[in-house]
A protein has these predicted regions:
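C-terminal substrate-binding/catalytic lobe of Rossmann-fold NAD(P)-dependent dehydrogenases
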Residues: 143-149, 158-323
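Rossmann-like NAD(P)(H) cofactor-binding subdomain of soluble oxidoreductases
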Residues: 97-163
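Rossmann-like NAD(P)-binding element
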Residues: 63-124
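N-terminal Rossmann-fold NAD(P) dinucleotide-binding loop
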Residues: 25-26
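Glycine-rich Rossmann-fold phosphate-binding loop(s) that bind the pyrophosphate
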Residues: 21-22
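Conserved N-terminal Rossmann-fold NAD(P) cofactor-binding segment
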Residues: 40, 44-82, 96, 315-323
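Short, Lys/Arg-enriched N-terminal segments with co-localized hydrophobic residues
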Residues: 1-6
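Conserved S-adenosyl-L-methionine
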Residues: 34-40, 144-146
Length: 323
């Protein structure tokens, strides 16, 4: 990843800003309040009343958590934020794909990102709005920030969904499951089955140990279950937000604590299996400087081809955009 300087002295490492206080933004703000990672949080929304209401509602839970300052503000209030979480954008409607949202949300980003850039913010820009891969690339271009400081939540949630479903299927703690969803956060996403394991035991072997012989069939069902999760939830309750809020919290934790955790975040790829200049998710080391290193995990031929197809699908959308 093309890097920039480490977290600057002008940054308050315990301050976070959340731009957009819809379902995802407010749920993320709540998860961040509970995390104890920050002492200050500012919420920004085009609807100032909404931001003020969410800030008050979340702040009323502080006596049960840790002391911090939660306010609604404007772009001048984010200059010293260590992390700026961007969730603002139109939500996915039933039957709509994430890529269907492109033009609406690119237009929203064309008003938000320059506001951040012109204030010369030195924090990390974490993009959460969908389609996250496209919008992350748009944010890099519009901000002019170094690539290591602008990345998306990517397939962090998809990978968690995969671990959850595998844990349920195999009757094992989901935290012991090590498996990645890579590529687009969307319909062309790929399960990296060839590297999936349960505490070092390859998935296929673990299935047999658990008495599952038809594991190929089960794995395909699980892959489809992950891919269709959001559609299923949106159909039933109009939006998904709790899972992604936990993903946002996890990424922020890795940054603030400089954990150097490996997370499947969305960033511009450089010669990843021949993919160049397209933003998609691959595991990366995440710490206080944002993305420290992208990891080209071992993929079999079929997975490599699927990853290239995912990149092509995203590239076509990018070429259609006027940015």
């Amino acid at each position: 990843v093309k890097g920039g300087p480490i977290m600057s002295k002008g940054i308050n490492s315990r301050k976070v800003a959340v731009i957009g206080t819809g379902f995802v933004g407010s749920s993320s703000a709540f998860a961040l309040m509970e995390s104890g990672l920050f002492t200050e949080m500012v919420l920004i929304d085009a609807d100032k009343n909404r931001a003020e209401g969410e800030a008050l509602d979340i702040a009323h839970g502080l006596p049960f958590a840790r002391p911090m300052k939660i306010t609604a503000g404007d772009y001048d209030d984010i200059v010293d934020a260590a992390i700026i979480v961007v969730t603002a954008g139109a939500g996915q409607k039933p039957g709509e794909t994430r890529l269907d949202l492109v033009k609406k949300n690119v237009a929203i980003f064309q008003s938000i990102i320059p506001e951040i850039a012109q204030r010369k913010c030195e924090g990390i820009l974490l993009i959460v709005a969908n389609p996250v891969d496209i919008l992350t690339q748009v944010a890099v271009k519009l901000s002019g920030f170094p690539e290591n400081r602008v990345f998306g939540s990517g397939t962090t949630l998809d990978s968690a969904r995969l671990k959850y479903l595998l844990g349920e299927h195999l009757q094992v703690d989901a935290r012991s499951v090590h498996a990645w969803i890579i590529g687009e956060h969307g319909d062309s996403e790929i399960v990296a089955w060839s590297s999936a394991n349960v505490s070092g035991v390859p998935i296929s072997e673990f299935c047999e140990m658990r008495g599952y012989t038809e594991h190929d069939e089960h794995m395909e069902e699980i892959a489809q279950g992950v891919k269709n999760s959001a559609y299923k939830i949106i159909e039933k309750k109009k939006a998904t937000y709790y899972g992604v809020a936990m993903a946002v919290r996890r990424i922020c934790e890795a940054i603030i604590r400089d954990e150097k955790s490996v997370l499947p975040v969305s960033s511009i790829q450089h010669d990843t299996y021949g993919i160049e200049g397209v933003t998609l998710s691959m595991p990366a080391i995440v710490g206080k400087n944002g993305i420290e290193k992208q990891l080209a995990i071992k993929l079999n031929e079929k997975e490599q081809e699927a990853l290239k197809k995912s990149a092509e699908a995203l590239k076509e959308v990018l070429e259609d955009l006027d940015i």
